[in-house]
Amino acid sequence: MDEQKSCRNKCIFCFIDQLPKGMRESLYFKDDDSRLSFLFGNYITLTNLTQHEIDRIIKMHISPINVSVHTTNPQLRCKMMHNRFAGDALRHLESFAKAGISLNCQIVACPGINDGDELLRTFTDLEKLGVNMTAVVPVGLTKYRQGLYPLTEYNQETAAQTLDIIEKFGDECVKKYGRRIFYAGDEFYIKANRPIPDPDFYEGFPAVEDGIGMIACLKEEIEFAVEDSEYNDALNYKVTMACGEAVAPYLRDMMKIIATKFPNIEINVVAIKNNFFGGGVNAVSYTHLRAHETD
């Protein structure tokens, strides 16, 4: 593959813009390449696609395409992405949908900007397009936001309000189509202080790498692993597991599942405060755990 296409936007919530200096160079590259979307599941904004590329995707039926939508309000999308063409790029969604291209969508929800009524509008528009899946995750804010657009984090009340919208719309889709389609990131449940849904809720975990159902998926895997393991009283040791603050309570509960069958194994879960990015960044608390599990 030739040189990767970089992002032409300057989104108000961009995580890369919130990184400190001095990290490895590859972390600062903003990819926005449709080829990587198909090959590796990267999300693209559609703002740098040429008509030739659109035609090629449709002709070759390159599917699925993962799209960072954020909002279907053209004016608001331009504002959120600091790109005057961002609203016009939404028309590509309809072109892909008409061509039978499967669309997986992502929405980074920002309090008071693209949630509430705007989120309902986006859901309604995406439902009409027949998208395959839409993941909604809360904006992540680091302590390195000097000079950037003023954003606020979700608190328990606002997270619960947004979660209600997502779950209600998803419930309606289950009734109409037999599939949920619209999912909330695990962080919404954590911030709203609500229980993580059971694995069946996630219908095969279509967006687990986006933080959708990651906790439920890990718990299910542990349950299966324990069930398939034979009891061995010779297993007698202590383990210390370090993780982020957000996931620590859930991991402690999961370790009890192991202790039930292997009482001689003592697992101590230690929560580590994220001083590097700041306390507002919680996704890495369990996303990195999951990533290292597959290394």
Listing of model-derived features with the role each one plays in the protein:
Residues I113, G130-E157, Y177-P199, K273-G279:
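Flexible glycine/acidic-rich beta-alpha junction loops that bind and position SAM and/or redox cofactors
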